Regions:
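Solvent-exposed loop and beta-edge segments used for protein-protein assembly and interaction
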Residues: 16, 65-69, 78-80, 87-91, ...
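Core alpha-helical transmembrane segments of integral membrane proteins
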Residues: 163-200
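Solvent-exposed beta-strand/loop surfaces of large extracellular or lumenal domains
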Residues: 41-51, 56-60, 102-122
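Hydrophobic residues positioned within well-ordered beta-strands of beta-sheet architectures
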Residues: 22, 71-73, 86, 122-124, ...
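Extended carbohydrate-recognition surfaces in non-catalytic/accessory domains of CAZymes
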Residues: 1-81
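An acidic-aromatic loop/edge-strand motif
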Residues: 115-176
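Extended low-complexity, serine/threonine- and proline-enriched intrinsically disordered segments
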Residues: 22-28, 94-101
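Aromatic-lined ligand-binding clefts that engage carbohydrates, nucleic acids, or primary amines
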Residues: 75-100, 134-136
Length: 200
């Protein structure tokens, strides 16, 4: 269903993490707050799968890749209130996040008159049930990418913490493997160079 993601108890059980990639309402060139949606004054939206495009142009050569845009997604959660976590990867290059009507956080300043970029990851925990509207206003004038290019991760606090810990562990293993490969390459290069010097 367009604009709504249904999350059942089964979807949120155990260590399950839901990646919020699909069904986003996307409003390029607009900075809509929850009040605008409540008043039904929004126009010009389209549906978007995050990661399909790297900037606000949506692949069109006639549209600007930088600028501002609003993202909107509705979550349909179980009726029993629970504490959830929303993990936001890098959003380029400044944004404000609303949950329902509440302004929850900002990274940098997406306001066009006071734009300031600040890129970083963010984890938000909140208690909710039923319908939750996620509204994100993003602005970019300083990076090759624009807006939300990586889907947020959603789940219970425990599930998100385990997901982030696993990511960190894998990143650490990868860096260690790269370092070990580089050290071995340097060792064999020096060994080969030394042997060649002895031959000649």
């Amino acid at each position: 269903m367009g604009g709504v993601m249904f999350c059942s108890d089964a979807d949120l059980s155990g260590d399950s993490v839901i990646f919020l990639a699909h069904q986003w309402n996307f409003f390029p060139g607009k900075q809509y707050t929850p009040s605008d949606f409540n008043e039904k004054s929004v126009t010009g939206g389209t549906f978007l799968t995050l990661g399909s495009f790297g900037n606000f142009s949506l692949g069109s050569t006639s549209e600007a890749s930088n600028g501002t845009a609003t993202y909107r997604l509705t979550l349909s959660l179980p009726d029993t209130a629970r504490t959830y976590s929303l993990y936001l990867p890098e959003i380029f290059s400044a944004y404000t996040l609303y949950l329902n009507e509440e302004k929850v956080c900002s990274q940098g300043n997406p306001d066009l008159a006071h734009y300031k970029d600040l890129i970083g990851n963010k984890e938000i925990s909140f208690t909710a049930s039923g319908t939750v509207h996620i509204t994100i206003i993003a602005t970019n004038y300083s990076h090759i990418y624009s807006g939300i290019t990586y889907p947020p991760a959603f789940g219970t606090v425990t599930a998100i913490q385990k997901y982030l810990s696993t990511r960190l562990f894998i990143s650490g293993i990868t860096l260690a493997a790269i370092f070990l490969f580089g050290a071995c390459s340097l060792f064999f290069f020096c060994r080969l160079k030394h042997n060649n010097a002895l031959v000649f």
